[in-house]
Amino acid sequence: MNAGSENSTPRISEPASPLAQAVHIGDYRPRLRIGEYGTVASVGDGIAWVTGLPSAAMDDVLMFEDGSWAVVFALTKKRIGAVLLHQSENLTAGTPARLAGRTLDVPVGETLLGRVIDPIGNPLDGGRPLETRNRRPLDSPSPPIIARDFVQQPLYTGTRLVDTLVPIGKGQRQLIIGDEGTGRSSLAIDAVLNQKGREVRCVYVLIGQKRSTVVGTIELLRNYGALAYTTVVVGEAGSLPGLKYLAPFAGCAIAEDWMARGHDTLVVYDDLSTHAQTYRELSLLLRRPPGREAYPGDIFYLHARLLERATALNPANGGGSMTALPIVETRLGEIEAYIPTNLISITDGQIYLDSDLFAAGFKPAIDVTRSVSRIGGKAQHPRIKEEAGRMKLDYLQFLELEIFTRFGARLESGMEARIRRGRLLREILRQERLQPLPPEFQLAWMTAYNEGLLDAMPPGSVQHALNELNSALRNGSPPLEASRTDWLTWLRQNLPEPARGEA
């Protein structure tokens, strides 16, 4: 074999001598690693029962050998009940389990704007993984009383009826309640769309919704430019019950982080009826004692703990706010049911959507007589509050008078004029979805109505006149702080001819 072939032959290292091996063994220092390991006893319906792990505590994260993981949800003397958050096909009885040494948290921060995620922070929009080191616990204590401030700033939803008669303030918790198909989600989506350009960051939480509904909502937000300042948290109908249960807490934690940084936020929980049903399902599977309507006894505490985190912080704590719009479904208009009454007592007011009004074509189908905002009026702009008070009185009197006309009762001429104006007002309050309106427009039409500038218009043409008025507003109008005289002067110059002529 020549020299070239010797150089090309790979060299094999010689084994270490026995003396060298002895030196290495002598240097070795054993380090004991102590850990707890358990075993899956049974698994099914999104629940895993685990034996062992004596130091496990509530809300601890469990890791399974096959890659699945769960969160501790029930503790008994012999077993641990865990709610699965990721389940592989290989998870079976006998799979080893261990404690992860942490509790549940979710990524937070600027990178979440415009993203669609699941409740544990995994992207669902096909985008790149979230690049943030900031995380926040899903379940954290609500801000203390000393850190809170009064609700003082209005949050405009863009809906005529809401911004005038049932106003909402930043930091308020306002329930949206009604039967299925009455426009509850549409009202919340309009509120999100109206935050464009208002420096309000939004979180829309979809709980137990069908995939088609989820996709439709996301596309709607994207098409109207609202996804740029919104994060969507999805626990869809086909996902594990644990993900549906955690969805509102994840959305709240994301908004809570922005609030702590001094931003105004809006959170929509769509909807908490499904969330309550999911919690009931998990509780029954974990063999917790059932209470009224088979819900566990702490269902009220669960939702109160979630919604109490929405507030307005004082300037010393950043001055941010979190406004919550929880949605709840009723059946056949029964607002006295268990979950609706719970949420009514927790929140600061409710917007009730009536199925009869919806069937009659009045949209949004808000029943003013059963809707209330307990603290929103304090945050309402003084000029809007002044005009809304006069208009609301007229509308409520009209609703009472209209009942008598159904029995064929004869009315005096003054009463007939009131009914005529009331029907005109009802037509004004109609509004198509996805058409949020600025507060200046709300003040303009209420001032015009209260002054009688619209009385000459037939109800069928008043919407066209209001559209022209809104177009004129875009070209310039007095500020909200302007006097009533200034607004009346501007209205007489910009209202369509029929109204201006009669004025």
UniProtKB/Swiss-Prot annotation:
Record GO cellular component, one term: proton-transporting ATP synthase complex
UniProt keyword annotations, A-Z: ATP synthesis, ATP-binding, Cell inner membrane, Cell membrane, CF(1), Hydrogen ion transport, Ion transport, Membrane, Nucleotide-binding, Translocase, Transport
Site (Required for activity): S371
Signal peptide: none
Alphabetized Gene3D superfamilies for the sequence: 2.40.30.20, ATP synthase alpha/beta chain, C-terminal domain (1.20.150.20), P-loop containing nucleotide triphosphate hydrolases (3.40.50.300)
UniProt KW Secreted keyword: no
Enzyme class, spelled out: translocase
Enzymatic reactions: ATP + H2O + 4 H(+)(in) = ADP + phosphate + 5 H(+)(out)
Membrane-topology annotation of the record: Peripheral membrane protein
Residue runs in coiled coils: none
InterPro entries, sorted: ATP_synth_asu-like_sf, ATP_synth_asu_C, ATP_synth_asu_C_sf, ATP_synth_F1_a_nt-bd_dom, ATP_synth_F1_asu, ATPase_a/bsu_AS, ATPase_F1/V1/A1_a/bsu_N_sf, ATPase_F1/V1/A1_a/bsu_nucl-bd
Pfam families cross-referenced by the UniProt entry: ATP-synt_ab (PF00006), ATP-synt_ab_C (PF00306)
Domain of life: Bacteria
Subunit structure: F-type ATPases have 2 components, CF(1) - the catalytic core - and CF(0) - the membrane proton channel. CF(1) has five subunits: alpha(3), beta(3), gamma(1), delta(1), epsilon(1). CF(0) has three main subunits: a(1), b(2) and c(9-12). The alpha and beta chains form an alternating ring which encloses part of the gamma chain. CF(1) is attached to CF(0) by a central stalk formed by the gamma and epsilon chains, while a peripheral stalk is formed by the delta and b chains.
Biological role stated in the UniProt entry: Produces ATP from ADP in the presence of a proton gradient across the membrane. The alpha chain is a regulatory subunit.
Family from the record: Belongs to the ATPase alpha/beta chains family.
Protein name: ATP synthase subunit alpha 2
Originating organism: Methylococcus capsulatus (strain ATCC 33009 / NCIMB 11132 / Bath)
